[in-house]
């Protein structure tokens, strides 16, 4: 069997090196996501030459991601097949993009059946469109921001620092409490997968090389966002929170962070705002910004010979 290990911050350097060889725009191929979401999906990593191998044990069963890196991809997939066989499992590959599916079919013709995972598609946006909000399609977003500025004249955007992380965590807990109250429920924030992931990101913020921004109104944090580089031209927005009762707060933190990324990373062309998980409200919100690209995701299962 392949010796997979759970990721730790110490793995970031070698994992990033291999991910850079793949230069993939899907948020699944990002060390931060592999680390902070490991309790939810039980990610495990291994290295095979210049390939990163990823195994996960999520709600849909035991799976592998398509190898990321460079070299003999067919050999890497055969190694995954052997590992799955030793574990008594079918080889299931998840988060495959269309180019990866085409490559899989080239080397293993007719051996895999593939199904689309629409709920997992990533939404990519041209960074200039999110930073400038030009054009008729985004007129409503400009109106939301105008209303936010009118109603909150003391608003200020600033970069997240280690000193302000506790305030962001406190704001997230309050955001969650308000959300649950609207739904008639009360429970602790850290019981949810996202709460665990966010706490891990904040606890290892500097080790993971994360960046972020926040908005204050009368000195209080009312919105924040956290992200990092995903590929040569794409930046991943991992977390974004704003008080929903403040009209335009989400639109404002979205715009301000896009402007910050554009200024500090001029090579970035797209912002990946990740998937909608099949949640109708999230899908509507992400579609309302009219994505420039969708990173399609598929699952491929090896059929018995």
Provide a role label for each language-model segment.
Residues 92, 158, 269-273:
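Short catalytic-loop micro-motif centered on adjacent basic/acidic residues
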Residues 100-114, 143, 277-294:
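Conserved active-site alpha-helix within GNAT-family acetyltransferase domains
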Residues 109-189:
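Acyltransferase donor/substrate-recognition loop-hinge adjacent to the catalytic core
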Residues 210-303:
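Aromatic (often tryptophan-rich) hydrophobic motifs at membrane interfaces
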Residues 10-38:
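Intrinsically disordered, low-complexity, positively charged segments
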Residues 162, 170-232:
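A mid-sequence, solvent-exposed acidic-amphipathic segment
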Residues 27-99, 216-244:
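Conserved donor-binding loop and adjoining core beta-sheet/short helix segment
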Residues 90-107, 119-121:
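Short, glycine/charge-rich beta-strand/loop segments that flank catalytic centers
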């Amino acid at each position: 069997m392949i010796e997979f290990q759970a990721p730790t911050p110490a793995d970031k350097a070698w994992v990033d090196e291999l991910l850079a060889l793949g230069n993939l725009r899907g948020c699944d191929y990002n060390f931060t996501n592999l680390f902070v979401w490991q309790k939810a999906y039980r990610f495990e990593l291994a290295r095979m030459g210049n390939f990163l191998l990823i195994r996960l044990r999520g709600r849909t069963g035991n799976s592998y991601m398509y190898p990321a890196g460079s070299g003999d991809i067919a050999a890497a997939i055969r190694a995954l097949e052997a590992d799955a066989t030793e574990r008594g499992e079918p080889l299931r590959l998840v988060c495959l993009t269309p180019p990866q599916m085409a490559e899989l079919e080239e080397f293993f013709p007719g051996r895999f059946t593939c199904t689309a995972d629409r709920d997992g598609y990533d939404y990519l946006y041209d960074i200039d469109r999110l930073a400038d909000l030009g054009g008729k399609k985004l007129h409503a977003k400009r109106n939301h921001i105008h209303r936010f500025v009118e109603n909150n004249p003391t608003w200020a955007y600033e970069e997240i620092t280690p000193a302000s992380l506790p305030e962001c965590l406190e704001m997230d807990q309050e955001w969650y409490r308000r959300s649950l109250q609207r739904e008639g429920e009360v429970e602790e924030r850290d019981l949810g997968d996202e709460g665990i992931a966010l706490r891990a990101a904040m606890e290892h913020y500097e080790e993971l090389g994360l960046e972020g921004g926040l908005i204050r109104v009368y000195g209080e944090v009312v919105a924040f966002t956290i992200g990092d580089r995903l590929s040569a031209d794409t930046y991943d927005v991992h977390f974004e929170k704003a008080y929903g009762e403040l009209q335009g707060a989400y639109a404002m933190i979205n715009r301000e962070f896009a402007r910050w990324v554009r200024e500090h990373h001029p090579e970035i062309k797209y912002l990946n705002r990740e998937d909608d998980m099949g949640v109708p409200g999230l899908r509507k919100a992400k579609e309302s910004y009219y994505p420039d690209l969708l990173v399609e995701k598929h699952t491929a299962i090896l059929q018995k010979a």
